[in-house]
Amino acid sequence: SPKRQELRSLKDINLRINDLPNIKRNKYSVVIDPGHGGSDSGAVGIDGLQETDVVLDVSKIVTKLLLEKGVSVKMTRDKEVEVDLSPRVALANKTNSDIFVSIHANASRGKKRYINGIETFYYSGWRGRLLAEKIQKEILKVSPGSPDRGVRRGRYFVIKRTNMPAVLAEIGFVTGRLDARRLEKKIHRRRVAFAIAKGILEYFKRVG
């Protein structure tokens, strides 16, 4: 039953909180940016799967996991509201966060169902690249069969205008047959959130 499955997946993630790397508590701060929101639903995919819902769900779980590990976290939105790009950047710059992580889901032109995959963008610098590589690697681990579209430089406003290492993760295609089937499931969203949290913590361990 769905209820039992839900319980099993909760147990699954509780066990796994202990599997996340430990870092010095109360030292690091992160801004998590769920893409889109409100009347801006972002990409709309198979069976009406909306990017905004998927990424908000994943972002909330990432936030919860990081808080458990003693990281200070701010979200640019924590409900279905529309937020312009400038205030997202302003929040990160004003709070002087260590890193900025924007979470999105992809769509292919013409909604081609055979296009799936994971990609993570950074704007510049070795720290941005390292953060993107750590997150990309972990998301791929929980998305078997979904192509590795790589870590690339991107000129997105939110990662270009932020003053700290910043990345934009595309966690799969809502228009892709393989990715969409996963992204609509709670358990997969949890796994992706766990992967992103792990990538972030691995990054902090590495840069100190």
Task: Give the label of every model feature segment.
Residues 1-208:
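Catalytic-site microenvironment of enzymes
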